Every structure is written in structure tokens, then in C-alpha cells.
Amino acid sequence: MNILAIESSCDETAAAVIKDGTEILSSIIASSQAMHEKYGGIVPEVASREQLKCILPTITEATKSLDYDAIAVTIGPGLIGSLLIGVETAKTIAYVTKKPIIPVNHVLAHIYANFLDSRFSILDSRFPAIALVVSGGHTELFLMTNNKDLKWLGGTIDDAAGEAFDKTARLLGFGSRGGLAIQETAEKSFTVKLPRPLLHDDTLNFSFSGLKTAIMREWQKNSDHSKKFVSSLAYEVQEVITDVLVYKTMKAVETYDAKSIFIGGGVSANLRLREKFQKTDIPFYCPPISLCTDNAAYIGSYAFFRGHPVDWHSIEAAPNLIVEV
């Protein structure tokens, strides 16, 4: 079964054709990230205007010489203006082609980027699994009992891990490059100590708002913002965030006797995070770097394994779509 997938939740306009949930036949991404650089972050109005310009050319390129049996589209969460472009376009295609349409939760779909890795094959022995979705807007833990059944276990009570990376990058003068800039700069020249939030509480929740405050205080109390200080602060920020993510995930593994770990989302591209997970004694799966950030490929994979076709009239953009399942 071939699925045309459309993703427009933020600043990327993406379309892909996915076969049987595991094979990428095409994947096209039009990014407006460079345009947002001068603003120091994503401007919703600018993002939606770019989505409008890019959506049809992107879909046309993705479907060139390819047939598809159904349409999948991100309905949320995300920016309302951006979501509307993808949703209304998908509904129009469904109406014209008379093909089924499948609404997709963007956050949950990040997990299914793992199923698109050519090295991965779906085996029952890998379940139950713990899935960590970690991005600029979300930090969530799920229990997967098979390739389609998910149960929400916990998430951030304030800011996401990616938000902490992004704000730190801006503070250190790296613009909006976020976690990648922190990763490239991190080097322990001297000791900087930051708190590890909610590390030892009884829940599977996360909190990174206090960490952002602690980072700002550390920056303000050191007047000498030398290269060594910047690299040391970047190192500690990365250590704190990855320590907390791994600790909470492993706590979930122990609680639910999980057999494997899946991660997804933009922060899952962080090499230090991957290194720490690889040092655990449980099978660990992460997507190729190219599938960690927003794209339509994992939207199509999610739709194949977990999606349910609905009447196109009933689909609406849902910017505040909940992730608890």
C-alpha cells in the first residue's frame, strides 16, 4: 500500500510516498529555516506564507511518476496557520481523487521514523518497548506493546528538552541552531554544575524550565564569557539534558519490563544522547539523522501502522492536539 503523506506543522513543508509503512519511495522537504534566522526564531505568519508557496510544488515533486492509495496528513499539534495549509490541501486531494484520508498526530509519528530505517525489521520480540519523543516542543515517554498500541507514561510539565537547547544556543550567541550548536561547542575545560531537574522524583515526567533559569544565572554570574567558559557551559547543558532523558527512559524500561527503546524527534539526533543510550544493556533504536527532524516520511509510516481513514469533511487542524493516548 502506498501512502501520500503531507507534513506542515511548523516551518517545513514536506511530502512523501511511503510503501507499506517501511519503504520511502520519495521524500521532499522545503524548509524556510534560513528565512527565520534573521528573526531569531520561527515567525508563525512567515511560516504559513512559505507553506502556501511550497505545498503544491512539494507534493507534485513527491508524487512524480508514483501512484498512491491513500493520503495521510498532520493535523497537529503545531502552528495553526501552517497546519491549515497541509490539512486543507490534503482534504482537497482526497475529495478530487476519492481516496481515503488519514489524520496523523505529529508527535506520535516521530516514533515511526525508526520503522523507515533499512536496518530495522519489525519483530514481536522487541515489544514491549519504551518510546521517547524529544523535540523543541515536546518531551514524552510512551509504552509500545506492539507496532501500533501506545500508552502515554509521562512528559514535560513545562518546557521541552529542545527548548532548553535552543534557548541556551541563543544565549551563547549561536542563533537558532539549537542542539547542534551546543553539541559542536561542548567541551569540558573547567567545571560548571547545573541541576538535574526531577531526576529522582517518582514520576516519569520532565521539567526543563528551572534548568533554563539556572543556565541564565550561571551566565550572568560569570563576567568573563571566554571560549572556554562557553564550551564548558555548553558541555554541562548537554550532559544535564541527556542524563535526565536517559535516566527517565531507563526508569520506564525497568517499571514496564521493556525489551527495547525507540527514540524520535529533533533532539534524538544528538550524538551524546545516542552514545549514552548505546551504553545501556537494552536494544536501542534511533532513526537516521535525516529522519529526526520534521519530514513527511514518518507521517506515512504512522498512518500505515496506526492510522484510521476518516471522512474528509471531519478533518480539522488541531494546533493543541494532545499526545496522551
What are these model-predicted stretches?
Residues 5-9, 16, 26-27, 125-126, ...:
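A short helix-loop
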